[in-house]
């Protein structure tokens, strides 16, 4: 606990900046499914075209995430912190924290002990470190996959011209242009990861085409599809998969008032279904209302048009 408090003390403010910066630094942390950050993400993807999508999925990330990337992620945060505040007086302490978080073997006086690898599960800082580390891994993968090409193609700046990726912990989604889709895709990426013991879900299990990329319709990131708004082409909806929204209704918790918690979950489910359009929203609402009426409870009053106006308001659109 003390160690977590120390990390928050020295890294908390800069970690918040990572969440604020969003797709500008390839981060999906803090992405608001109903807000303009989704449209901003899709505009980042549009830079190289909404055609050849990447959608990775890791298994056993925590057990195979290299300490090298944990340390590098901390160092990146330290560098950003010192540039922003213009002070290096905490440098030694912050590097010591980074080394402690990155290494399994610790020495204290005459004691030598081993700690669990990686950041603690459930700690908010873990997502920040994993996100930055995942981003760094992608550039290393690019360098390895393009090393045989002439010139400086292997450099990170060249990757940024042809590939746009976004990371949220161990989740990633992205796009690659036609020039490099045969070199940098889910199949070739998984082959590189496998060399280093990273369990990257085989693309064939995700419905990815043989060349290792997929269409916008098949693209899934953070368990969601992305749908362009019918009225305003620069607005995008983040549609959490149907099965996830329906599964939410079966969640069970042993804390608080069960009915209040269920209604909160139903509200989240309805707001999530909004992204799927009016017809599926109404079908979902009607199905829930049938159950509520059967047990003598009042029906839902969620209104698609109200949610639509709120969606447009968040995007700065004025509608009658």
Describe these PLM feature segments.
Residues 27-29, 121, 222:
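Short glycine-rich loop/turn motifs that provide flexible caps or phosphate-binding loops at active sites
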Residues 3-63, 139-158:
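Active-site-proximal segment of RNA-dependent polymerases
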Residues 32-37, 158-164, 172-174, 209-210:
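Beta-rich nucleic-acid/ligand-interaction surfaces
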Residues 27-35, 84-97, 152-155, 197-212:
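A generic structural motif
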Residues 1-16, 99, 132-140, 264-276:
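Short, hydrophobic/amphipathic alpha-helical patches that form generic packing surfaces
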Residues 113, 124, 180-320:
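Active-site and adjacent loop segments of nucleotide-processing enzymes
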Residues 11, 15, 42, 59, ...:
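Short, well-ordered alpha-helical packing segments
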Residues 49-167, 174-183, 218:
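Conserved polymerase palm-domain catalytic core
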